[in-house]
């Protein structure tokens, strides 16, 4: 009984089946190795025993034919094709044997597969044809072979990223491939999913010859102002990347708009200044670009150059601002306007008296004989200030002289002047001495809203939207602020607001100034002049509101964190695989308040408590 109860292991069991499965896996592995290594004899013997091995796939869906292509085994490929291998079978990524051969740049294998009936119009899971992959290879023959088999629709086929073979040729910096595709009918006006044309990618590659090839196409000039998803044109990309030679190449096209605006109203000059590309800044200025255009933050290119600390760009932009001529308003006469002096009001009064006497003298010359010299104190005052007013007593346009009549009181006391009808409207302002731009340091980034010169007529108009021509350094402003106590002690008719910066002459009062103060019994209202703010961030006013200049004594100032915008959001991979592709070039970071959260602002505010004291 005990013998019958013993278990019999001689019969086949599950272990024997598993052992058989493992042996089959080992056989397939040997087949794949023989195909990739070119072992024709071993591969032939195995396939003769079981022809179904030709259709077997590994974990990635690759057949023995694909392994032979990966190993660049031409004889093995021919053998497998003769034995009946499926030439158009796709792997797990949708790639055929021809697609793999093209990715590898294997010209002999591609020719062999095409001659044996391989289809060149089967896209992979990324939507790319073998023609897309051929643009990455420096050998032109591979692309030429595929173009001979392709029609127009296949040449302009767009992958899942919306990129055509022409896009990829420009992306891979292949001028000859680009020229060949254009000759075969590639459309340069097609855009990818980011609204980029092939010219955008050519500009990013930094190859001027490649850009000129696309622009020489009959449709090239029509795409020069195409903007991508962020509103950037080819000029924006060239300026941000520092390709000044490409900027000149693009500017040769008459349709090129050098002052195109992106979604944040930034010009190419804004991006060049923010990126610190001095050569591009100089090139754009030489091409006549306006340096005073503002973006949505009311910031000029000079403001971004100051903010980012690019001194070379600051010098170029500040020189451009200083060399701009001050143009009078259209209503003014064409005669050059005279500068407003401190004694301009008194000068207009006395000059009017002189002109009236000159006109009367011209009408009646005989009056000169019997006329006695006027020894009044008014004439003494005229003589005293002749040396000060200089040439201001020359004839001025009649519409610029205030028509005010005065009553003269003849008494032994000192004479004074009173307005008869209305107060005298002062047209000038005390002189504001322009200073050079402040030095750029890491801890002191000044912003200036604008450096455009404004005439005195413009200062008398309603709300100001532009700052003064230049801006004092912080040390000099502190020095002037310490003198405000002395200013309040002076009985000065030109009393200014605490935010206004005057020249050094305002702080010293002579005897002639005191005499002038006694003469002006009715003081005209003072007009305020906004001073460029010393801000460490770019102010972004809400939409629909005018830009207002902030006082230097503002209590709360928030620093904006830097943000970066990727210039090439395409997948980065070797042989154009499914992994995301990255580019080396990133556009400069210009802070924008559109994407900043409140938490980020509060954290930046707490990290920089000293900025609130400014």
Curated annotation (Swiss-Prot):
ANK repeats lie at residues 26-55, 60-89, 93-125, 126-157, 161-190, 194-223, 230-260, 264-293, 297-326. Gene3D superfamilies: Ankyrin repeat-containing domain. InterPro entries: Ankyrin_rpt, Ankyrin_rpt-contain_sf. Pfam families: Ank (PF00023), Ank_2 (PF12796). The modification Phosphoserine is found at residue 475. Residues 7-16 have a biased composition (Polar residues). SMART domains: ANK. Residues 354-373 have a biased composition (Basic and acidic residues). Keywords: ANK repeat, Phosphoprotein, Repeat. It comes from the Eukaryota. SUPFAM superfamilies: Ankyrin repeat. Residues 1-20, 319-339, 354-375, 454-476, 564-614 are annotated as: Disordered. This is Ankyrin repeat domain-containing protein 55. It comes from Homo sapiens (Human). The lineage of its organism: Eukaryota, Metazoa, Chordata, Craniata, Vertebrata. The gene is ANKRD55.
């Amino acid at each position: 009984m005990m013998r019958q109860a013993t278990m019999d292991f001689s019969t086949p069991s599950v272990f024997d089946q598993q052992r058989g499965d493992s042996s089959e896996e080992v056989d397939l592995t040997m087949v794949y190795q023989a195909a990739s290594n070119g072992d024709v004899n071993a591969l032939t013997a195995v396939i003769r025993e079981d022809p179904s091995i030709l259709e077997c796939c590994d974990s990635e869906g690759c057949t023995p034919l694909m392994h032979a292509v990966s190993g660049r085994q031409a004889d093995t490929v021919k053998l497998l094709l003769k034995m009946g291998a499926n030439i158009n079978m796709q792997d797990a990524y949708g790639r055929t044997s021809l697609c793999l051969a093209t990715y590898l740049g294997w010209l002999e294998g591609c020719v062999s597969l095409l001659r044996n009936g391989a289809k060149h119009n089967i896209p992979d899971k990324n939507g790319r044809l073998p023609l897309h992959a051929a643009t990455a290879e420096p050998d032109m023959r591979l692309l030429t072979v595929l173009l001979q088999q392709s029609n127009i629709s296949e040449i302009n086929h767009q992958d899942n990223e919306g990129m055509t073979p022409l896009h990829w040729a420009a992306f891979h910096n292949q001028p000859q491939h680009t020229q060949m595709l254009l000759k075969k009918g590639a459309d340069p006006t097609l855009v990818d999913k980011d609204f980029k044309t092939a010219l955008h990618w050519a500009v990013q590659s930094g190859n001027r010859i490649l850009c000129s090839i696309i622009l020489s196409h009959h449709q090239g000039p029509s795409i020069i102002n195409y903007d991508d998803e962020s509103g950037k044109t080819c000029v924006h990309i060239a300026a941000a990347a520092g390709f000044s030679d490409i900027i000149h190449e693009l500017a040769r096209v008459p349709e090129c708009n050098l002052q195109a605006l992106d979604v944040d109203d930034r010009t190419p000059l804004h991006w060049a200044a923010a990126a610190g590309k001095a050569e591009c800044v100089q090139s754009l200025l030489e091409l006549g670009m306006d340096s005073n255009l503002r973006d949505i933050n009311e910031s000029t290119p000079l403001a971004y150059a100051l903010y980012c600390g690019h001194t070379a760009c600051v010098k170029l932009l500040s020189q451009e601002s200083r060399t701009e001529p001050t143009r009078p308003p259209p209503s003014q006469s064409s005669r050059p306007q005279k500068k407003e002096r401190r004694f301009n009001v008194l000068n207009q009064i006395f000059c009017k008296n002189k002109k009236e006497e000159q006109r009367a003298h011209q009408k009646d010359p005989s009056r000169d004989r019997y006329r006695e010299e006027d020894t009044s104190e008014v004439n003494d005052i005229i003589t005293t200030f002749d040396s000060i007013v200089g040439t201001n007593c020359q004839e001025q346009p009649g519409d610029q002289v205030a028509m005010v009549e005065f009553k003269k009181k003849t008494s032994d006391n000192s004479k004074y002047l009173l307005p008869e009808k209305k107060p005298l409207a002062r047209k000038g302002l005390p002189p504001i001495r322009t200073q050079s731009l402040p030095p750029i340091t890491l801890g002191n980034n000044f912003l200036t809203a604008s450096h455009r010169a404004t005439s005195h007529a413009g200062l008398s108009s309603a709300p100001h939207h532009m700052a003064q021509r230049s801006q004092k350094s912080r040390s000099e402003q502190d020095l002037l602020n310490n003198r405000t106590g002395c200013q309040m002690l002076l009985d000065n008719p030109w009393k200014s607001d605490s935010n206004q910066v005057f020249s050094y002459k305002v702080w010293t009062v002579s005897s002639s100034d005191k005499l002038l103060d006694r003469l002006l019994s009715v003081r005209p209202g003072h007009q305020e002049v906004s001073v460029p703010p010393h801000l460490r961030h770019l102010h972004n006013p809400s939409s629909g509101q005018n830009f207002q200049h902030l006082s230097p004594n503002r209590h709360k100032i928030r620093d904006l964190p830097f943000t970066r915008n990727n210039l090439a959001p395409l997948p980065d991979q070797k042989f154009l695989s499914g992994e995301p592709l990255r580019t080396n070039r990133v556009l400069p970071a210009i802070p924008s308040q559109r994407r900043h959260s409140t938490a980020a602002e509060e954290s930046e505010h707490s990290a920089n408590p000293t900025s609130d004291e400014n």
